[in-house]
Amino acid sequence: MPPINIVILIPARLNSSRLPNKMLADIEGAPLIVRTWQQAQQSSLTRQVVIATDSEEIAGVMKACGADVVMTSPDARCGTERIAEAAENIDADVFVNLQGDEPLIDPGNIDLVIKPFLQENPPDCSTLVYRLLAEDYAALHDPNIVKVVMDSQSNALYFSRSPLPYQRETYAATRCFRHIGIYAFRAGVLRMFSEHGPSMLEEAESLEQLRLVENGYSIRCVETDVDMPGVNTHEDLELVRRLYRSRRS
């Protein structure tokens, strides 16, 4: 295949409902969004990392670090709509959607989600999944942990906050997967995302990836064995701070 241009887009907003201003929360001397950007910079397959935000405060912090920033509308209904707007004036073949609250993202996972686009017959979109084991029973029933089921070609059939698949008699954990919210999109697919508008299942589950599923786009799921915590709550933030301190000690 000919070389392709790949750009990482990081959506970032201040008005998080569960942890306000989390993007600027300090993690060992740097804001959370800066830590995520630093990890993204280590990807070996991308040529640019861009912050997409509607916050002048976030924009100022990131520009001071030397990051590329695109200002977006405050009306975006989800992170993918925000990066779709940012992508309108960026020349790339593939865009990676990396959530801004992932300061411990493994750069290898970023490269892993890109790899389906370096092969023949690339999908419309790709994402990562992590296998749930027997001791992860609680995770299967946690609505804050998104589960996914796939077909025989590892394409997503459905995502849900409910247990997937439902176990009628036994807990077959070896075939249960949690979804990791990083995506790569063909440029044309990303640009069509906002045009479709929120779908019925997307609104029911509050999962933006279901907009793609309902509209017939393929989402290739790539399994990873590295799953680091994101930051959605104050408890998550304290855990990430402890992990950063342990790395430095």
UniProtKB/Swiss-Prot annotation:
Superkingdom: Bacteria
Involved pathway(s): Nucleotide-sugar biosynthesis; CMP-3-deoxy-D-manno-octulosonate biosynthesis; CMP-3-deoxy-D-manno-octulosonate from 3-deoxy-D-manno-octulosonate and CTP: step 1/1; Bacterial outer membrane biogenesis; lipopolysaccharide biosynthesis
GO annotation, biological process: CMP-keto-3-deoxy-D-manno-octulosonic acid biosynthetic process; lipopolysaccharide biosynthetic process
Keywords carried by this UniProt record: Cytoplasm, Lipopolysaccharide biosynthesis, Nucleotidyltransferase, Transferase
SUPFAM superfamilies per the UniProt record, alphabetical: Nucleotide-diphospho-sugar transferases
Any single Pfam family the record assigns to this protein: CTP_transf_3
Listed EC numbers: 2.7.7.38
A single GO cellular-component term on record: cytosol
Swiss-Prot/TrEMBL catalytic activity: 3-deoxy-alpha-D-manno-oct-2-ulosonate + CTP = CMP-3-deoxy-beta-D-manno-octulosonate + diphosphate
Annotated localization: Cytoplasm
Keyword Nucleotidyltransferase: yes
EC class: transferase
Presence of the UniProt keyword Nucleotidyltransferase in the record: yes
General function of this protein: Activates KDO (a required 8-carbon sugar) for incorporation into bacterial lipopolysaccharide in Gram-negative bacteria.
Protein family per UniProt: Belongs to the KdsB family.
HAMAP family per record: KdsB (MF_00057)
Protein name according to UniProt: 3-deoxy-manno-octulosonate cytidylyltransferase
Source species taxonomy: Bacteria, Pseudomonadati, Chlorobiota, Chlorobiia, Chlorobiales
